[in-house]
């Protein structure tokens, strides 16, 4: 390249402006990208560091794509499970309140929240059709037949249905997991599904 042509390119303001704009775009893109990655790392560290219930309350891989019906019997409500978090953080789970329990029983057993949250939780679940209440045992079985869950978690001793299960229920519910009234059995079976 001749000297005259080099001098013209050095004096050309359009070329300098284009180079400045390109450098600015690259710098801004890098800063945005690095801040985005930093935010993700901070969020990951928070969830790892918390070790809290939100991180632990995920449905086990075996049950992620299955619909689950959990009967909130007296034994389940009195267990040591974090029911408040399970009720709010479970997406494909429907909770059934059997005929022998009322909303007040549910409210009394989902503790560790202030009064306002405790009384709003069942209403929120009812409004989202995650909590169904039946008035008798026949209604309970009709709910199950209409829901057709893949898995049913029930303490049949609490409901008094150990010997009264309809024969055709297995046509509507693929897997029935019967839970004993023992708190350890309840915690073991339910935590294997709801707590990672």
UniProtKB/Swiss-Prot annotation:
Cellular localisation: Peroxisome membrane
Predominant localisation class: membrane
Positions of transmembrane segments: 15-37
Family annotation (Pfam families): Peroxin-22
UniProtKB keywords: Membrane, Peroxisome, Peroxisome biogenesis, Transmembrane, Transmembrane helix
Primary role: Involved in peroxisome biogenesis.
The protein's name: Peroxisome assembly protein 22
InterPro entries: Peroxin-22, Peroxin-22_C_sf
Keyword Cytoplasm: no
Family: Belongs to the peroxin-22 family.
GO biological process, one term: peroxisome organization
Source species of the chain: Debaryomyces hansenii (strain ATCC 36239 / CBS 767 / BCRC 21394 / JCM 1990 / NBRC 0083 / IGC 2968)
Bilayer disposition of the protein: Single-pass membrane protein
Keyword Membrane (UniProt): yes
The encoding gene: PEX22
Gene Ontology CC entries for this record: peroxisomal membrane
